[in-house]
Amino acid sequence: MCVVYRTSVLILLASGCSGVFDTPEDSKETQIKKSFAKTLDMYPIKNLEDLYDKEGYRDGEFKKGDKGTWVVRSEMIIQPKGKSLTSRGMILYMNRNTRTTTGYFSIEEIDSRKSLDERETEKKYPVKMINNKIIPTEEIKDEKLKKEIENFKFFVQYGSFKGIENYENGDISYNSEAPIYSAKYKLKNDDYNVKELRKRYNIPTEKAPKLLLKGSGDLKGSSVGYKEIEFIFIENKKENIYFSDGLNLIPSD
């Protein structure tokens, strides 16, 4: 995983199962929520191997007979005031054709106080998944880190967006020329997803986050565009705390 700067983090989501889309009178906010709901309605998927049997958005980019590969990704990014930015997360590639999964756990640190050639460091630990269990494929001597990897849970396994249509008064942005779009909503600390994140991560702030839904490409679906979701707790030049998650169906190699 490559977290270079705050604005360059792209966690991808594909538009999932098809259904009735928007009507001409739908607002852009409604269209954005419906576009994301096609994938987010699948949350939670407790057993990730269920994705082998789940369809996603496919277009001409997929070869005939290719069922596609699900890309699952979650990461927590924390930058305390005056310190370096650290990202810890995992990405899996779940091939629906071969029903096999590989990926890696990543720890990345970015320290803008250092010289350019020393500013960024990243360590990747390759993994595979069998019977819904994450298994490191190389020896890890650090037992604490090994357990962190083996017990890692993706947001898609416990998050829920069943009430996304009820989110209101979002900060909406839409550029038809690109096209790019986003919707940002203020959440409370008693929000289900916020509570679940706080259970699993040591989030060093009591501030309630904002939920950001952001994407590019055709709102009705595109395999070349992107969609990302983020829970942004703090975002400024000196301090950043946010969580990113993605679920994307891409053509298999």
Curated annotation (Swiss-Prot):
Location(s), subcellular: Cell membrane
Keyword Metal-binding: no
Keywords (A to Z) from UniProt: Cell membrane, Lipoprotein, Membrane, Palmitate, Signal
Keyword Oxidoreductase: no
Lipid attachment in record (S-diacylglycerol cysteine): C17
Lipidation (N-palmitoyl cysteine): C17
Signal peptide positions (record): 1-16
An annotated GO cellular component: plasma membrane
Membrane topology field: Lipid-anchor
PROSITE patterns assigned to the protein according to its UniProt record, in alphabetical order: PROKAR_LIPOPROTEIN
Recorded family membership: Belongs to the staphylococcal tandem lipoprotein family.
Protein name: Uncharacterized lipoprotein SA0399
Annotated organism of origin: Staphylococcus aureus (strain N315)
